[in-house]
Regions:
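FAD-site-proximal beta/loop scaffold in flavoenzymes
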Residues: 118, 124-140, 236-288, 292, ...
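Residue-level detector of alpha-helix initiation sites
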Residues: 12-13, 36, 112-114, 153-154, ...
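A Rossmann-like FAD-binding core segment of flavoenzymes
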Residues: 69-95, 100-101, 164-262, 302-321
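FAD-binding core/adjacent interface of flavoenzyme oxidoreductases
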Residues: 1-9, 25, 30, 76-144, ...
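Predominantly flavin-linked oxidoreductase catalytic cores and closely associated redox partners
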Residues: 99-196, 205-211
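Beta1-alpha1 glycine-rich phosphate/pyrophosphate-binding loop at the start
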Residues: 4-74, 144, 156-182, 254, ...
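Glycine/Thr-rich phosphate-binding loops of Rossmann-like dinucleotide-binding domains
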Residues: 40, 116-117, 156-157, 179, ...
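Short amphipathic alpha-helical segments
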Residues: 19-20, 43, 118-121, 159-161, ...
Length: 321
C-alpha cells in the first residue's frame, strides 16, 4: 500500500501533462502507465502538429514526455489499474496488478481507442496504409487514392480533410444513408474528389509486396457481390470506444461512455478529475489532450490546497490501513 497526493491513471499526453504540472508543484505524482505506454500516440508513425516539433515519431514524443516528467519527480509505473473505489470519497483506492494506492486526488486520463473493423489485415497494416487519423497521416497520402470507412461526422470531416492531399477519397458505408449531419453531407457530396460506395462493408485489407496496403476486399451487403478495390490507404472512422468501463457506476458518463467533466475537469466525484480523450469526444489531438491534462493537473493542485488542513501525512495514512 502506498499513499499518494496524486495518482494519474493513463500515460497519454493528458496523463503526462498532468504529471508535469503536479510534479513541478512538488506533489510527487505517480502515473500508472497502463498496458501501452503513451497510448494511441505511441502508435503514430509521425507527428507534425505538436507545437515546437516539426516532425518526430509518436514514440519519440512519448519518451520526451516521460523523461520530462521524471526529471521533475513524477514516478512512472509500468502497471495497469484493475479496480478503483471512489465511493467513500478522498482518499480513493486505486488497485493495480502489483500495488494498492491510496490517493488524495485521482486524475483519469485513460483515453479512448478508435473502434476497430476487426477484419483480416487491419492490425497488420496499421501505419502502413491503415490509419485512424486523417489529421495525423493525411499528409503521407499526397496524390494517392484512399478509402474511408464510416458514415458519421468523423468519416465525412476527415474525408474532406484528406482531399487536401489525396487524389481521390472513396467513402465506404455499410448503409445507403449517412449518419453525419446535413452540412457535412452537403460539403462532402459537392467535393469532386469524394465518391461513395453504399451498402458495402470491408471484408479484408490486402497488402502488396512492399508490405503496405494495396487493396480492400469489399462485400455489397444487398447483392452479396464480393470484389477487390485497389487503394493506397484505408482510413477507418467508425467511432471511438472510451476506456471508461473500469469506472462504471462511479464516474458519470454521457450516452457514448465519455466521462462528464466541468470546465475545471472535475468529475462528479469531488477530488477525481478527468482529461483527454476519456472526456473529450471532439478534438482528439495530442496538443489538445496535453492542454486538458495540464488544466486537470492544476485543478488537482488547487483541490489539494483547499483541503490542506484535512490531508493526512502520507506515512500515517498507510500505517492506519
Ligand atoms: P459515429 O457518429 O458513431 O459514426 C460511426 C459511423 O461508423 C456510423 O456511420 C456507423 O454506421 C459506422 N460504423 C460503426 N461501426 C461500424 C462497423 N463495424 N463497420 C462499418 N461501419 C461502422 O462516430 P463519429 O463519426 O466518430 O462521431 C462521434 C461523435 O462525435 C458524434 O456525436 C459526432 O456527431 C461527433 N463529431 C462531431 C463532429 C462535428 O460536429 N464536426 C466531427 C466529428 C465527430 P451506421 O451509421 O450504420 O451506424
Amino acid at each position: 500500500m502506498q499513499k499518494k497526493r496524486v495518482v494519474i491513471i493513463g500515460s497519454g499526453p493528458a496523463g503526462f501533462a498532468a504529471a508535469l504540472y503536479t510534479a513541478r508543484a512538488q506533489l510527487k505524482p505517480v502515473l500508472i502507465a497502463g498496458n501501452a505506454l503513451g497510448g494511441q500516440v505511441s502508435q503514430t508513425h509521425e507527428i507534425e502538429n505538436y507545437l515546437g516539433f516539426e516532425s518526430l515519431s509518436g514514440m519519440e514524443l512519448v519518451q520526451k514526455f516521460q523523461s520530462h516528467v521524471e526529471h521533475f519527480g513524477a514516478q512512472v509505473v509500468y502497471d495497469a489499474v484493475t479496480e478503483v473505489d471512489f465511493t467513500k470519497g478522498s482518499p480513493f483506492t486505486v488497485k493495480t496488478h502489483g500495488e494498492t494506492y491510496l490517493a488524495d486526488t485521482v486524475i483519469v486520463t485513460i483515453g479512448a481507442d478508435p473502434r476497430k473493423l476487426k477484419v483480416p489485415g487491419e492490425a497488420e497494416y496499421i501505419g502502413r496504409g491503415v490509419s485512424y487519423c486523417g489529421t495525423c497521416d493525411g499528409f503521407f497520402f499526397r496524390g494517392k487514392d484512399v478509402v474511408v470507412v464510416g458514415g458519421g461526422d468523423s468519416a465525412l470531416e476527415e474525408s474532406l480533410f484528406l482531399t487536401r492531399f489525396a487524389n481521390s477519397v472513396n467513402i465506404i458505408h455499410r448503409r445507403d444513408t449517412l449518419r453525419a449531419g446535413v452540412q457535412l453531407q452537403s460539403r462532402a457530396k459537392k467535393n469532386e474528389k469524394i465518391s461513395f460506395t453504399w451498402n458495402t462493408v470491408v471484408e479484408e485489407i490486402l497488402g502488396g509486396d512492399d508490405g503496405s496496403v494495396r487493396a480492400v476486399r469489399l462485400k455489397n451487403v444487398q447483392t452479396g457481390e464480393v470484389y477487390e478495390k485497389p487503394t493506397d490507404g484505408v482510413f477507418i472512422f467508425i467511432g471511438h470506444v472510451p476506456n471508461s468501463q473500469i469506472f462504471a457506476g462511479q464516474l458519470a458518463t454521457n450516452d457514448n461512455g465519455y466521462i462528464i467533466t466541468d470546465q475545471r475537469y472535475r468529475t462528479n466525484v469531488d477530488g477525481v478529475f478527468a482529461a483527454g480523450e476519456i472526456q473529450d469526444e471532439i478534438w482528439r489531438q495530442v496538443i489538445t489532450s496535453a492542454g486538458q491534462g495540464a488544466a486537470a493537473g492544476m485543478s488537482a493542485i488547487h483541490w489539494l490546497e483547499e483541503h490542506e488542513d484535512e490531508l493526512q501525512p502520507l506515512e500515517e495514512a498507510v500505517q492506519e490501513t
